[in-house]
């Protein structure tokens, strides 16, 4: 039996398919580069300072912007910092000499109960139209732009040994940005870290902010662990 070879094989089609196969890995690699670039653009480098003087020392030619960013962070802290009905509740969370009294903002509710047994003090604070909030321990500042103002966000820290925020820089949502140390330092954060935070509209119970810090820390560890696993496996 004789096997006949066909003369109708389209060699160009085979060569084209082979070229496409060889180009596929290249296309995937290029796509990966673009995806990595997109991820990089979603992060930005920020600086953490305790006060405007630290910023000015690190950026002598931009002292005015340092002060402006600091003052803007103070204003933001008044709106977004956790609020407490009593001084005792605030001190329990943040420590002695770490709290200040602030006028109640429009729309700030007072229905959230406190675990403090000093109900009379709570009623007096609510009647006086003021609440207690932690002092701003530092601020996070975006990149300084020539002639413009840098974005900033307030940071808080606790001196209470029982608080998850003890010795840490945390924002108003409870997210931690590492040790609250002097001298200034830089780090890379998601751009969402510099986005405006929602204004505080209710008082919180004693220990409530600490719970938020603990939850945020757990989420950060999980995200970091997941990222590492993908990098190793990928």
UniProtKB/Swiss-Prot annotation:
InterPro entries per the UniProt record, alphabetical: Biofilm_formation_YgiB (IPR009576)
Residue ranges, annotated region (Disordered): 105-129, 149-234
Annotated Polar residues bias: 150-175
Highest taxon, organism lineage: Bacteria
Pfam families assigned to the protein according to its UniProt record, in alphabetical order: DUF1190
Compositional bias segments (type: Low complexity): 110-127, 188-205, 216-234
Family: Belongs to the UPF0441 family.
Name used for this protein in its record: UPF0441 protein plu3956
Upper classification of the organism: Bacteria, Pseudomonadati, Pseudomonadota, Gammaproteobacteria, Enterobacterales
């Amino acid at each position: 039996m004789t096997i006949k070879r066909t003369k109708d094989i389209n060699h160009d089609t085979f060569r084209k398919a082979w070229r496409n196969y060889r180009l596929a890995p290249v296309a995937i690699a290029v796509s990966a580069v673009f995806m990595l670039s997109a991820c990089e653009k979603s992060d930005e480098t920020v600086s953490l300072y305790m006060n405007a003087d630290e910023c000015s020392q690190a950026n002598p030619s931009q002292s005015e912007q340092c002060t402006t960013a600091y003052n803007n962070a103070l204003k933001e802290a008044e709106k977004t910092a956790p609020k407490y009905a009593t001084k005792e509740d605030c001190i329990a969370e943040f420590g002695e000499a770490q709290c200040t009294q602030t006028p109640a903002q429009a729309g700030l509710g007072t229905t959230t109960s406190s675990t403090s047994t000093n109900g009379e003090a709570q009623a007096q604070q609510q009647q006086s139209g003021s609440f207690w909030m932690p002092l701003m321990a530092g601020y996070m500042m975006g990149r300084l732009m020539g002639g413009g103002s840098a974005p900033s966000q307030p940071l808080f820290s606790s001196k209470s040994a029982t608080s998850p925020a003890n010795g840490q820089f945390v924002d108003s949502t409870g997210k931690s940005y590492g040790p609250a140390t002097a001298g200034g330092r830089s780090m890379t954060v998601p751009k969402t870290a510099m986005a405006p935070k929602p204004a505080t509209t209710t008082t919180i119970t004693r220990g409530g902010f600490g719970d938020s810090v603990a939850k945020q820390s757990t989420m950060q560890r999980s995200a970091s662990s997941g990222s590492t696993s993908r990098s190793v496996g990928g």
